[in-house]
Amino acid sequence: MTARNKRVRCKICGILELEHALAVSDAGGDAIGFVFYPPSPRYIDPAAASRIIAKLPPFITTVGLFVNHSAEQVREILNVVPLDVLQFHGNEDNDFCRSFSRPFYKAIGVGDETDVVAEAAKYPDAAALLFDTHDPQLRGGTGRVFDWSRIRHELGKPVILAGGLNPTNVAEAIRTVRPYAVDVSGGVEASKGVKSIELIQEFIGEVYREYEV
């Protein structure tokens, strides 16, 4: 299998409803994300996330998104929600991220001044690095694309591409970056925080179409 047709994995983040989680699974998605950051319009109560996970089919990875939570807060959520992976979007360091006995992804906001290599080097234990558009006011879910040419594959970690992706641009993003996975939230929403089953299906369909080329 060539690099051209290795299947890119797909994560849909900001899930609030069971029907949308099942739509991800039915369409062939690989992972769903739950946002535990209260200021986000996609915030979900941990008990609600746990109820959704209990009804998921096998082989769907569940990811929890955290932003500068304390270790106690993270553990309280983990006591309620059976997450597979933790995803950190704040100023957490490597030691903090790895302290919960679960794989973790570290989000890196990419702006004009971001030294991508230096930022990546701070997280040697990350299972993957997630690159998103830098915005000092937002932690993910910016809805804006950054310069994909900034991503460097010599980072030595799987690359998850996020930031402004949607069904119309994800194919180009995959061809340009060749990431391990793509991550979308706002790009598959009918309105802020409200997922669209049709857009979820279109987005995942575009990801698979690139694999089939």
UniProtKB/Swiss-Prot annotation:
InterPro entries attached to this UniProt entry: Aldolase_TIM (IPR013785), PRAI_dom (IPR001240), RibuloseP-bd_barrel (IPR011060), TrpF_fam (IPR044643)
Alphabetical UniProt keywords: Amino-acid biosynthesis, Aromatic amino acid biosynthesis, Isomerase, Tryptophan biosynthesis
Gene Ontology molecular functions: phosphoribosylanthranilate isomerase activity
Entry keyword rRNA processing: no
Gene3D superfamilies: Aldolase class I
Keyword set includes Amino-acid biosynthesis: yes
Reaction equations catalysed: N-(5-phospho-beta-D-ribosyl)anthranilate = 1-(2-carboxyphenylamino)-1-deoxy-D-ribulose 5-phosphate
Coiled coil: none
Pfam families: PRAI
Enzyme class: isomerase
E.C. number(s) listed in UniProt: 5.3.1.24
Pathway participation: Amino-acid biosynthesis; L-tryptophan biosynthesis; L-tryptophan from chorismate: step 3/5
A GO BP annotation: L-tryptophan biosynthetic process
NCBIfam families according to UniProt: PRK01222.1-4
PANTHER family found in the cross-reference section: N-(5'-PHOSPHORIBOSYL)ANTHRANILATE ISOMERASE
UniProt family annotation: Belongs to the TrpF family.
Protein name: N-(5'-phosphoribosyl)anthranilate isomerase
Organism name: Hahella chejuensis (strain KCTC 2396)
Organism taxonomic ancestry: Bacteria, Pseudomonadati, Pseudomonadota, Gammaproteobacteria, Oceanospirillales
Originating gene: trpF
